[in-house]
């Protein structure tokens, strides 16, 4: 096994240090399944488990549009899913040559540390969404998009971002 090439593994669970956690899981299973010392050495020497931050809202199976989408793609897909257009994938490591994800049109950031990006995401995006929930519901507005079209809600969010959220970074 030592002669086999390794893998670059991109963990996508939304937990801190997801690459390290996945590596620990793989090591435990390798031990439980008695894959041996050669496998353990190959795993250690040839493979990289990257920590990542994935930011994209995935809304689930598109029940109302599923038939139309399946007809368009020419197959039934019971695992069909929908997602918002915005996406960000922050990956710890330097594998841009091996994985030219940006060339495929993905919004990817290669970095030495995911943590600062997570801090920004949690504070700015999650903070803004949290700040909008109750005022928006009181105004009978159900989506962020609708909230941003309302001048009073947009002004409220702008104030929250500039006065309270951004100064914490």
For the regions a language model picked out, list residue spans one by one.
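Substrate/ligand-engaging "lid" and interaction regions
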Residues: 1-169
């Amino acid at each position: 096994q030592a002669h086999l090439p390794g893998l670059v593994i991109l963990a996508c669970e939304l937990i801190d240090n997801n690459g390290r956690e996945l590596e620990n899981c793989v090591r435990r299973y390798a031990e439980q399944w008695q894959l041996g010392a050669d496998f353990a050495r190959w795993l250690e020497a040839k493979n990289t488990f990257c920590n990542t931050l994935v930011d994209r809202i995935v809304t689930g199976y598109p029940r109302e549009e599923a038939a139309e989408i399946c007809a368009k793609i020419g197959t039934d897909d019971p695992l069909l899913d929908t997602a918002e257009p915005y996406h960000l994938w922050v990956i710890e490591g330097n594998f841009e040559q091996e994985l030219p994800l940006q060339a495929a049109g993905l919004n990817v950031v290669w970095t030495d540390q995911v943590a600062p990006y997570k801090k920004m995401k949690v504070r700015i995006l999650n903070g803004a969404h949290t700040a909008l929930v109750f005022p928006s519901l009181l105004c009978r507005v159900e989506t962020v998009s609708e909230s941003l079209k309302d001048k009073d809600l947009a002004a409220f969010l702008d104030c929250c971002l500039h006065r309270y959220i951004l100064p914490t970074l």
